[in-house]
Amino acid sequence: WHDEINLPKTDLVVLPGGFSYGDYLRCGSMASKSKIMQSVTKFAESGGLVLGICNGFQILVESGLLPGVLLRNKYLEFICKNVHIKINKKENFYFKNIEKDIFEFHIAHNEGNYFCTEDQLKDIEDNNQIAIYYCDINGQTSDQFNPNGSIKNIAGVFNKKKNVLGMMPHPERMIDKSLSGEDGSLFFKNLIKNLK
């Protein structure tokens, strides 16, 4: 798989979580240089849909497809827990027609502290690129509900065209009531509906 250079015909590329290359150097750094990423970059630049979850988000940032960086968590500890997030439903494919604004997703990361320069932050705010915020159960953002120190409680961002989304929370871990919740299945069902 690490020698592949061409993407098959696809509607959506998903870069999942999973500590690629053992997270040596920086999370996502080595994976961002893998051969297939040239094709992923071309696909994204031509308007193709790319979703990065956790380590996938780190890879997208390291490859330059998304702005900013993901640093060590504020308290330098691995975080593994459920969090509430608020999504930005304005003008994007990923959350179009989704029924709710506030979700409960799982996080599991050591380097999920989103950071960007002041100029980058102004840019992503002006372009409505903040996709997901950490929040409380009512959608209020504050440092108290920011698990990792991310600037502005950012849990996910879009590129300028909004065809690329990176997010630290794991929707795939919340797809069944017996596995602590179904909010992730709402996300994926909506995504599939939007792809049709």
Give the label of every model feature segment.
Residues M167-P171:
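Glycine-rich phosphate-binding loops of nucleotide-dependent enzymes
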Residues G56, H84, E104:
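Conserved beta-strand and immediately adjacent loop positions that scaffold enzyme active sites
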Residues E91-K160:
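Catalytic beta-strand/loop cores that center a nucleophilic Ser/Cys/Thr
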Residues G56-F57, E91:
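Short, flexible active-site-adjacent loop segments at beta-strand->alpha-helix junctions, enriched
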Residues H84-K86, G156:
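Residue-level detector of beta-strand face positions
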Residues W1-I53, I59-I79, K86, K122-E125, ...:
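N-terminal beta1-alpha1 cap of cysteine-dependent amidohydrolase-like domains
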Residues F78-K81, Y133-Y134:
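Central beta-strand plus flanking loop segment that forms part of the substrate or channel wall
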